[in-house]
Amino acid sequence: MKYRRFGKTELEMPVFSCGGMRYQHKWSDIEWSEVPDEGQKNLEATIHRSVELGINHIETARGYGSSEMQLGPVLKQFPRKKLIVQTKVAPFATTREFLDNFNTSMDYLQLDHVELLS
């Protein structure tokens, strides 16, 4: 895999990313029991193969429905330093609303930080 420096940071980004818009089972928050086993296994295999190929930038968003929730258990299977995780949170009228949504993302992703937030 080829990597490029991300802007003026020291972050080495793969030239390909693993985008999470289509990871979700639904475009809304759902209960874990609603996620089909086959779909979750496919997501897990996709992420494992991506990381195996050097595609370690995993991108998702709060607005991608169940994507973050489904990614959380998969991301835990990798050494944290091996991944570059990015999520996105829409702007809100208040700081409290923004933080509530960001914290929901972090809870679903089962992470204590993300490398990139947009």
Language model features with spans:
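N-terminal binding-site loop/beta-alpha segment at the start of enzyme catalytic domains
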Residues: 1-83
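Active-site-proximal loop/turn and secondary-structure-junction residues that shape catalytic pockets
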Residues: 22, 62-64, 89-93, 118
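Glycine/proline-rich, positively charged
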Residues: 27-35, 48, 93-118
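Structural motif corresponding to the early beta-alpha repeats
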Residues: 78, 82-99
